[in-house]
Amino acid sequence: MDIVLLVKAAVMGIVEGLTEFLPISSTGHLILAGSLLGFDDDKAKVFDIAIQTGAIFAVILVYWQKIHSTVVALPRQAKARRLALNVVIGFLPAVVLGLLFGKMIKAHLFIPVVVASTFIIGGFIILWAEKRPPGSVRIEHVDDMTMWDALKVGLVQCFAMIPGTSRSGSTIIGGMLLGLSRQAATDFSFFLAIPTLIGAGAYSLYKERALLSVADIPLFSVGLVFSFISAWLCVRWLLKYISTHDFIPFAWYRIAFGIVVLATAWTGTVVWAE
């Protein structure tokens, strides 16, 4: 296989890993990187599933101890059952809305003005969320969330169907605005990512199954490995970062990136569409 193509796969994997779990929208960055690298044909849709899988493996590894202890404790601990149920409840709204409106959103909202607007608006929402008064935090730990809290975060996650919004951004910042601490919102966002990304990937794999080829295994493997490594490093870094910092730098980054989207679309440098 062409070494240049493998290098492109590695770059795309790194972009996915670094952006999937930060509140900056992996979709927008993958579109930009794919367009600049010439890695944006139909096969790229299947490749996106591979690199997303690498990111899923990374977050599972980082949270493995918590996931394992929760699963083992399900028969005897109400706290474990509540967390598992909350993840399921938070996951369901995206499933329903995705099946009902997924095609329509991809057909009508994947345009530069929408992508740029969601980047910029999302940036200002982060700035607003970080200005919360100290007493607005109701929930310090993810285990203390109620089913109602989980449902509300799950509903907020549905906004991530709009390109440029960011799944992690919507759930983390949405959770904070709903009264979760920065740590609790981030933890629940990562737990929620596991079924959400697995479900979306499985559905996309089924839809694009005609594009699968054994010859592409090396390409997909490279992307998956680099996505896994970069996502693992990114998640570990973010968990340390939020213990002493806020999300304001990401807000300004989003606003700047939204301007980049408009500029590249206006000049024709990047084709912001599927």
UniProtKB/Swiss-Prot annotation:
It is found in: Cell inner membrane. It is a multi-pass membrane protein. GO terms for biological process: cell wall organization; peptidoglycan biosynthetic process; regulation of cell shape; response to antibiotic. Its main location: membrane. Its EC number is 3.6.1.27. GO terms for cellular component: plasma membrane. It is an enzyme of class 3 (hydrolase). GO terms for molecular function: undecaprenyl-diphosphatase activity. Bacitracin is thought to be involved in the inhibition of peptidoglycan synthesis by sequestering undecaprenyl diphosphate, thereby reducing the pool of lipid carrier available. Belongs to the UppP family. HAMAP family: Undec_diphosphatase (MF_01006). Catalyzes the dephosphorylation of undecaprenyl diphosphate (UPP). Confers resistance to bacitracin. This is Undecaprenyl-diphosphatase. It comes from Variovorax paradoxus (strain S110). The gene is uppP.
